[in-house]
Amino acid sequence: LFENCSWSPDFSDHRKWCLPGETAARDRLHQFVTRVVDKYDHDRDYPDVEGTSRLSPYLAAGVLSPRQCLAEITALQGNGQLPDFATGAGSWLNELIWRDFYSHVMVAFPRVSKGLPFQLITEKVKRRYDEKQLQAWQQGLTGYPIIDAAMR
């Protein structure tokens, strides 16, 4: 796979990426919250920096819970309050909330993962696909003041 590449990936420390066990998971959470989370909203998009939590395996396996993550984030705040969602910590917490929400959606409404609607009664609703109307909506130029104001 990599013989035609000008670089050679080094997988020698791949076992260190996700150490097993609850202690390792808690340590990773603490490291993320104390060292990385402040810049998460920016750095998460750059694979060349350590900008993500790397907690997905622990969350997926149930080794860490979203509640534990929330407790660590609120402890970081020092006042027991939720972080401002415009910060790195708030951005990460928001994504964690959506992750948890959609895992519940998939359990309760598995048909959604197959392209079907939440409410089956709406399945036969005819959809309009009008590029001009879509662009007007995206630009806040629908002619409906409340909609246009929200889009701008």
Regions found by a protein language model. Name each.
Residues 1-122, 128:
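Glycine/tryptophan-enriched, flexible segments
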Residues 123-135, 139:
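Flexible, P/S/T/G-rich "lid" or insertion loops adjacent to the active sites of thioester-utilizing
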Residues 135-152:
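Helix-hairpin-helix/helix-loop-helix acidic hairpins
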